Amino acid sequence: MPVPERIHIVGASGSGTTSLAAAIAARHGHRHLDTDDFYWLPTDPPYREKRPREPRLALLRDALAASPRWVLSGSLCGWGDPLIPEFELVVFLVVPSDIRLTRLREREIARYGLDAIAPGGSRHQAHVEFLDWCAGYDAGSLEIRSRALHEAWLAALPGPVLRLKGDRAVGEQLKLVELHGVR
């Protein structure tokens, strides 16, 4: 099997797509890109304003074209389908909801601080809304970022899909990706 030079890693928020992509990039020299860096306009605080679809696609397309070996983490369902032909391998991470939500809480604390997300904090409402949105992933419909949407999207892909349990250690996941052909 040819070495995958263009890998997309997708899963629910908190499934570990960014961590696995960073591990692949560090070990194999792929450039690591994350869909959030293209989906969202730079704001302070971050993740408040979506970048319009066409400029988002153009920026991501240019970034992918700038490097022959890349790993893209995050979801692009609903806006990034023109990029599907670029993927040599798609890795889908599946993680139980309780583990994902714990990871997300920890990430929010590390990113914003406990005081900011605690009741009365400057980010509390946004934090609660974000976790509520993330908690709906497994039962959500095709109209939102959900397991159902990801499964439908994956089923339509023309290339290989590697499904991994995202509650494994990143090193274990990396070995499984390597067995699938990364050198």
Language model features with spans:
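NTP-dependent small-molecule kinase module
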Residues: 2-4, 132-183
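Hydrophobic anchor at the beta1->P-loop junction of P-loop NTPases
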Residues: 9
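P-loop (Walker A) phosphate-binding loop of NTP-binding proteins
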Residues: 12
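ATP-binding Walker
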Residues: 15
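Walker A/P-loop
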Residues: 18
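Conserved substrate/cofactor phosphate-moiety recognition/catalytic segment
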Residues: 22, 26-68
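Glycine-rich phosphate-binding loop used to anchor ATP phosphates in small-molecule kinases
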Residues: 53-98
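A glycine- and Lys/Arg-enriched "phosphate-lid" helix/loop adjacent to the NTP-binding pocket
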Residues: 95-145
